[in-house]
């Protein structure tokens, strides 16, 4: 089978959509090595190196015009390339499909991650929203099959983009295998020293932006007089400055450690060393950091109201994303109960097996095969 992918995010996004895209490509190579995989990459420069795949062919814009304007190539050039390749399936990994793909004879799949920009329009520039709405509606309309990464996402794309429910398959995403590997004591010591991590800490990992609601954790620390520091792993943003102002307001300047340059390979140890992973995001399409925490046997507190119960499972604790007292109580409950911590770790590891590489790879291949004669 010839399977082609929009690999822009795989090569140029370090987290989020990039992580998802790289994992799909890795899993297909690992579990179905007899297929040919074609990866459309709009830019050669500063590309992330993917896991080796013997049957991967990377395709770039060829004409001067498309090299100068790679976005035009993604939108209007890829369909012609697919016809030349005589591809069987094209999978848009980040909510987009190229124009006129329905006229190529190539079966198309699109992964829809979320509709957050519809729920929270004030968080996104107006021009960005308009473009993305059109791209999303088009992809849902012309795709032969739509993959939703959670039940919540399925509900949202039906509601906001009028997607045909009969075309939608829920295929959960996983996380990198590095989070499933045992971390030895030497590695823990190395990482703790590298980032000057305290002996005990709470943890948040991901984009440092308003929607992630990290302020709830800070307010909970103040409300509950919790003396364990919080470590926030994520790149510097304007929202980070808001958080620092809040810390000053509460007199908690030394209670939060910001790590802006953590290596991906160090993240498993950073998770493992934490007492609790806290993810109070007001809305997510899936929430990969929650799964990463489960895979490293770290107890999880997450927010209600979106899909995080799907990614975190029954062993995690959930609180209203605006309830400071509830968050404070949840943190204290886990910290005070060693038996609960042990149970959350064991049950979390078991639940994470649902998102194993093999399950995800087989579910994706089932979607592809069901499109073909």
Tell where the protein language model's regions lie, with residue ranges.
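Carbohydrate transferase catalytic cores enriched for Leloir-type hexosyltransferases
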Residues: 1-373
